[in-house]
């Protein structure tokens, strides 16, 4: 009986410590995955790219994932930091390790399979493997639907937060390029440049995309980034405008490569397929 009592005390002590842990998540994919696994109760701060679920936008922010400061992190007194290989600069990563903080660095996802791997890794680290398997099963089912409904290679362009007269398009090697291919499209600029590059209105008209995707960061900007093309006389000859195939997409949902990427991609395909 005495041994049982001691064991219960130890278990309760460990449970209390876990409940009181202060966790910082850096990287939108990591933050979203932690919360999707229902383990976000101890998260006390996030980075700027973390926007899903919406409630994390109310948490203190520790900066941009590639430009984190040691002081900003340490001021939050974290017990654990969960991040990806995109975190930097390297000297800050080393300083945090030297400070004795439990810093867990996951591989940054680059595709659908990587998203599943990240779920596995985070779930294992947080000791919730069963929840991880359940979440993966849900995404696998959604991915199966995507494979059945995939688009038939329409010409697509993705613009990051476009403004009037400023069209920043995704080239090859970008997550937007992967998104376009994932839903069954072809990026009109994939053979022209890598990363993001500003293109002219003449380029857009010449390539005549079937579908235009406009990435927005804040929901209130969704209509604004769409109207730049929709209400412009200069683009009325473009197939995407004529056929009402112009969509605002949340950058957090489609470019952070968290669990919501799959469902958002499926919903986008369904919207495109329902337009007559």
Regions found by a protein language model. Give the residues of each.
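Sec-dependent N-terminal signal peptides
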Residues: 3-14
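Basic- and aromatic-lined ligand-binding clefts that recognize polyanionic substrates
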Residues: 19-35, 131-183
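A short, structured surface patch at a secondary-structure boundary
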Residues: 21-76, 80-86, 188
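Structured C-terminal subdomain patch of bacterial secreted/periplasmic proteins
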Residues: 21-22, 114-124, 133, 144-149, ...
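His/Asp/Glu-enriched short active-site or ligand-binding loop at hydrolase and phosphoryl-transfer sites
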Residues: 47, 173-196, 216, 248
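Flexible loop/hinge segments that line or gate small-molecule binding clefts
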Residues: 52, 90-121, 125
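Proline-aspartate-enriched helix->loop->beta-strand connector
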Residues: 62, 67-83, 101, 200-217
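Extracytoplasmic ligand-binding site segments that recognize negatively charged/polar headgroups
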Residues: 91, 108-120, 155-175, 223
């Amino acid at each position: 009986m005495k041994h049982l009592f001691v064991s219960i005390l130890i278990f309760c002590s460990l449970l209390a410590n876990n409940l009181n842990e202060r966790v910082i998540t850096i990287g939108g994919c990591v933050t979203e995955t932690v919360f999707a696994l229902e383990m976000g109760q101890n998260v006390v701060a996030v980075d700027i790219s973390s926007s899903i679920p919406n409630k994390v936008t109310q948490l203190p922010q520790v900066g941009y994932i590639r430009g984190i400061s040691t002081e900003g992190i340490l001021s939050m007194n974290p017990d654990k930091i969960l991040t990806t290989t995109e975190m930097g600069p390297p000297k800050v990563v080393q300083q945090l390790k030297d400070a004795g903080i439990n810093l867990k660095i996951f591989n940054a996802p680059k595709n659908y399979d990587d998203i599943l791997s990240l779920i596995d890794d985070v779930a294992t680290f947080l000791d919730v493997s069963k929840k991880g398997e359940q979440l993966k099963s849900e995404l696998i089912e959604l991915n199966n639907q995507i494979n059945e409904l995939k688009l038939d290679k329409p010409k697509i362009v993705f613009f990051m937060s476009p403004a009037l007269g400023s069209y920043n398009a995704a080239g090859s090697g970008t997550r937007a390029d992967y998104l376009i291919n994932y839903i069954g499209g072809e990026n009109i600029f994939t053979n022209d440049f890598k990363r993001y590059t500003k293109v002219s209105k003449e380029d857009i008209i010449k390539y005549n995309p079937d579908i235009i995707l406009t990435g927005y960061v804040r929901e209130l900007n969704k209509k604004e980034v769409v109207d730049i093309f929709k209400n412009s006389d200069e683009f009325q000859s473009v197939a995407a405008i004529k056929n009402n195939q112009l969509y605002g997409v949340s950058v957090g949902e489609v470019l952070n490569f968290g669990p919501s990427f799959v469902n958002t991609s499926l919903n986008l395909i369904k919207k495109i397929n329902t337009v007559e």
